[in-house]
């Protein structure tokens, strides 16, 4: 049954959590009304500061996210949290662990928490995450925190979806070397060494500082990622993280970097949507005689695969 999208958006703007949940469900489920939802949201976006948090499992991402929510709420900010969880290989459902970890915010009308499954997407972000960020932005969130699954070798996509990327590490986990391997040192705007009350925290911070220095080719006025030590479970160092985040935001706004990042993000989003649409069109051709005819010409040596692909793309774009 079709929903009244303008009314739903108006309710979301009023801060009604059910309306926000319904909009994200429409987005995540690729509803036939997806385009209508996006068109309605477009003029209402651009006000939220999007912060991405990533790091290996066990570094305390969810605890840190919860602590950041508390800090921003103390400052009177409305906060949205998008927790991207691994999909179950059997049910395809998100683990929803963040609901338990962030239960202290459950009754706060100024906080909206949502889980999204990665659905096997190697970048670590759910394919619908960019649209879900737009929903939270349009719903009046001042800050949107996007917490992703562990960094891994290919999970650096958060950098393309956030205004500021926070990389979390912890002592005794070999995170410094792992971060370098995963290319994380290239995407972090702020680095957090959590669980700083453990042995090895200072050494981890020094190692990270050394590695950042090795890869440094910054000029005067360029952003130099700070390293902040925290004990998120006790809220220690969280105010310093917020201070670092706000400094980075101010630096980006002053130099036009924030707009550049958002334009790049929108470009990536358009490209993803276009590629998905083309894949769907190509999938529709599997039973089409044109594809079979091209394949037969390749086998007969009359056509090479690249020329056939060019012909296929031309047919699709002209249709």
PLM features per residue range, with description:
Residues 6-9, 116, 191-193, 226-231, ...:
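Short hinge/gating elements
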Residues 14, 25-32, 43, 74, ...:
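Generic secondary-structure signature for well-ordered alpha-helical cores
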């Amino acid at each position: 049954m079709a929903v009244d999208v303008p009314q739903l958006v108006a309710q979301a703007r009023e801060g009604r959590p059910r309306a926000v949940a319904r909009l994200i469900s429409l987005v995540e489920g690729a509803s036939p009304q997806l385009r209508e939802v996006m068109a309605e949201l477009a003029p209402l976006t651009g006000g939220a500061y999007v912060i991405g948090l990533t790091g290996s499992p066990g570094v305390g991402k969810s605890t840190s996210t919860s602590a950041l929510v508390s800090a921003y709420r103390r400052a009177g900010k409305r906060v949205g949290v998008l927790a991207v969880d691994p999909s179950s290989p059997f049910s395809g459902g998100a683990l929803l662990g963040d609901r338990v970890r962030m239960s202290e915010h459950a009754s706060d009308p100024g906080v909206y928490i949502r889980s999204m499954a990665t659905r096997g997407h190697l970048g670590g972000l759910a394919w619908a995450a960019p649209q879900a960020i737009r929903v939270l932005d349009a719903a009046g969130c001042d800050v949107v925190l996007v917490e992703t699954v562990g960094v891994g070798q290919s999970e650096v996509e958060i950098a393309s979806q956030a205004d500021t990327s926070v990389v979390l590490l912890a002592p005794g986990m070999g995170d410094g070397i792992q971060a370098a391997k995963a290319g994380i040192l290239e995407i972090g705007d702020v680095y957090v060494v959590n669980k700083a009350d453990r042995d090895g925290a200072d050494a981890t911070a020094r190692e990270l500082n050394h590695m950042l220095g090795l890869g440094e080719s910054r000029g005067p006025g360029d952003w130099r990622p700070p390293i902040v030590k925290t004990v998120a479970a006790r809220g220690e160092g969280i105010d310093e993280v917020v201070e670092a985040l706000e400094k980075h935001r101010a630096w980006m706004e002053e130099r036009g970097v924030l707009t550049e990042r958002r334009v790049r993000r929108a470009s990536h989003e358009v490209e993803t949507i276009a590629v998905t649409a083309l894949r769907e069109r190509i999938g529709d051709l599997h039973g089409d005689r044109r594809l079979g005819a091209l394949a037969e010409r390749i086998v007969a040596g009359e056509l090479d695969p690249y020329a056939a692909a060019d012909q296929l793309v031309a047919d699709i774009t002209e249709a």
